[in-house]
Each structure stands twice: as C-alpha cells, then as structure tokens.
Amino acid sequence: MSAVTQEATAVPRTLQEVVFVDGVRTPFGKAGEKGIYAQTRADDLVIKCMRELLRRHPELPKERVEEVAIAATTQIGDQGLTLGRLAGLLAGLPKTTPGYSVDRMCAGAMTAVTNVASSIGFGAVDVAIAGGVEHMGRHPMGEGIDPNPRIIGERIVDESALVMGKTAENLHDRFPHLTKERCDAYAVNSQRKLAAAYAAGK
C-alpha cells in the first residue's frame, strides 16, 4: 500500500462590494382613528414603497431581486405572516423571489438591511430589498403579546424593559445632558469623519 497525501487547497476569502442604491419611505402620519393611515394596512405601506422603488429603477429587471427582508416588531394581523414574501409578491416581484420577516425591537429594519448586505457581500445574492414597517395606529406596541411572567417575577429584567417608551424616559432621567441638539451635533460630526475617511481612501 502506498500513502496518499493531499495538499490543502486554500480558498480565497473575498467579499463582494455592497452598494446601497436607493431608499423609499412613506410620509409621517399621526396614529389613531383620524390618522392618514388609519384605514391602510401595514403590508400595503410596504408594498407602496417597494412598487415605488421598482418604478424608479426600470433598468433593473424584477427577476434580478433575489431576496426581500422586511421587519416588524408587532408581528400580528396585517403585520404578521411572512411580510417579505407577501409584500414582494403583491409588489409585483416574481413568485420565485423568496422573502422573510425580521422580529426585533427597535433595530429590525436595520437588521434586515445588514442581513441582506451580508448575503450580497459573501455572494449568496446580487440584489435584495430590505426595510421595515410598524403601524402603531393599527397595532399599538404590545398588542396581543403574552410575555412569560417569570421574566418579571424572577427579576431577569426590569418591567420597564418591555416598553421602549419607558426606556426612553429612563435615559432622559439618567442622562439629561444628552439633548437633541447634542445628539444632532454628534451625528453631523460622525458624518464629517466618514467623509474625511472616504476622501483619505480609508
């Protein structure tokens, strides 16, 4: 018998460049029965945005869109099921275009964007649509949920952690010096640093 040796083949780890092409959103509106979206379904808000995005880019064949990721915190009623898939179909994408939902507090849409960006980066897809919806007028935060009582009873988290509005109030009370003006100035400075880094080729 002879010994057989195999040389390990190094697979190059290269990432594709990811480009954010365009963004669409609905106008702000007030919640409640008198709000401009009171009679509008949450999924229809997403569909309107997707249709507008596709209208703006006639150079992009719809079949080139290989993934749709849509986030919603309160996944109930017209924000339930698989928003990415259903909204994609109703927006006119082919039946072959897959989609999914992201359920995450406060950063769901951002997570949807980073998820598809990662997929593009390592070559799983070339073109994707990502975003989020939260129809507070139709689905107030916490509607239909039933958190396990042990979360509070065993003091795993403070009760205020279940309501983002309360968290915002706590932050204001603990850090009153973090005014909107200071936060805006910080954001502007961050963008300037980014522009300088790009200009320097970093």
Annotate each language-model stretch with its function.
Residues 2-18, 30-62, 77-82, 88-202:
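Acyl-thioester C-C bond-transforming condensing/cleaving domain
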Residues 22, 70, 130:
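Redox-cofactor binding/interface segments in oxidoreductases and associated redox assembly factors
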Residues 22-28:
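Short polar catalytic/cofactor-binding loops
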Residues 64-71:
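Short glycine-rich phosphate-binding loop at a beta-alpha junction
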Residues 73-75:
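Short histidine/acidic/glycine/proline-rich micro-motifs that form metal-
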